[in-house]
């Protein structure tokens, strides 16, 4: 019997996959527990529609990420932050990803999750720093952050 898996089943199939399985296994285990449904023409066309919608959604996310990258990497986009520093240019505190995300929201009205900002260690020096941001698995942007003394 051909079934369409509605959930991942270890050792058998993944969600959205169409596979031939024994009749008894399909009726008594997979379909009964809601792990799969019978692969009828209606179910197959519904699955294809869902896959098209998911592809369209993924393409829109990628386009949004590319648009955001263009904005972030513009020469005019410099995130301005300030902090107290000593005479040698070292800060008393540090600048974290949360502060950078908040500054992006306030200065440029761009909402970026702080977890997407890839900062190896908090910034502890004054001046300009290039900070990478992972907008999408395929799109990474660099923003310039300027840390000035208060």
Swiss-Prot record:
UniProt xrefs under InterPro entries: Ribosomal_bL9, Ribosomal_bL9/RNase_H1_N, Ribosomal_bL9_bac/chp, Ribosomal_bL9_C, Ribosomal_bL9_C_sf, Ribosomal_bL9_N, Ribosomal_bL9_N_sf
Coiled coil: none
Protein's GO biological process: translation
Cross-referenced Pfam families: Ribosomal_L9_C, Ribosomal_L9_N
Keyword terms, alphabetized: Ribonucleoprotein, Ribosomal protein, RNA-binding, rRNA-binding
UniProt xrefs under NCBIfam families: L9
Protein name: Large ribosomal subunit protein bL9
GO molecular function list: rRNA binding; structural constituent of ribosome
One GO cellular component, as annotated: ribonucleoprotein complex
Biological role: Binds to the 23S rRNA.
Family named by the database record: Belongs to the bacterial ribosomal protein bL9 family.
Membrane-spanning intervals of the chain: none
